[in-house]
Amino acid sequence: MFDLLCITDRALVREPFLDRLAAVAAARPRAIVLREKDLPQDQYQALAAQALEICRQAGVPCVLHTFVGAARALGARAIHLPLPVLRTLSAGERAAFPALGASCHSVEEAWEAVALGATYLTAGHVFATTCKAGLPGRGVEFLAQVCAAVPCPVYAIGGVGPENLPALAQAGAKGGCVRSPLMTCPDPGAYLRQWKEAAAHVL
C-alpha cells in the first residue's frame, strides 16, 4: 500500500482541533505527525499527551515533531525532526526513538540524515503547495533521486494528493504526506478511501 502520513496544522482547522484529530485517526492513515512547532514546548507537550492517547485508541501511530524533550518526557517512540535539530542530538538521544524521521530537501541532506540515524525521510516539496507559497516544486525527478540515494523509506511532501500517486510511486516513494486536505475536508474517512482507491491502481 502507498502510505499516507497526515501532517497536522491546527491553524487550518475550523472545529476543535482534537475533534479533527480524532476524525483523522478514525480514518486510519499510516501515521499522524503532530507538527505544531509554533507552540511553546510546555503547550506542545500537553497537546501531544492528548494526541498520543487519541491515536492509541484508534490504533494509529502518532509521530511527535521537533520537541525532543517533550517526546522523551511522554515516552514517545517516534519523532520527526528538521535536519538542524537532528544534528544536535547525541547517538544516545537518537537511539531513544525507534522511529526517527527527518525532513530533507536535497540528496546531500538525505545522506546526512541517514548517517545520523534517520529511519525514514520526507522529501520535498515535490509540487507547488500553499505551505510554500510562491516557490515552485522540486519535482518528481528530485524525489526519484532521493529515493534512489538512500536505503530507508522516503515519503513525498508538498502538493501531494490521490491524483499524483502514480508519479510518486514510480519515483520510488513509500508514501506521501498530506496536510491541508485532511485538516479542512468535510470527511477525512472519504479522503482516505479516495487515497486507498488511487493507491490500489498504482501498486
Give the location of each predicted region.
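Active-site mouth loops of central-metabolism enzymes
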Residues: 1-18, 98-104
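Short, well-ordered coil/turn segments that N-cap beta-strands
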Residues: 1-4, 28-30, 58-60, 75-77, ...
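Glycine-rich phosphate-binding active-site loops on the catalytic face of alpha/beta enzymes
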Residues: 6, 82-92, 122-134, 165-198
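Short secondary-structure boundary segments
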Residues: 10, 36, 83-84, 104-107, ...
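Alpha/beta enzyme core
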Residues: 16-31, 74, 84, 107-124, ...
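Conserved beta-strand positions in the central sheet of alpha/beta enzyme cores
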Residues: 33, 63-64, 80, 101, ...
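Alpha-helix-loop-beta-strand connector modules within alpha/beta enzyme cores
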Residues: 45-64, 83-86, 91-106, 134-162, ...
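Catalytic cores of alpha/beta
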Residues: 62-77, 105-117, 149-150, 154-156, ...
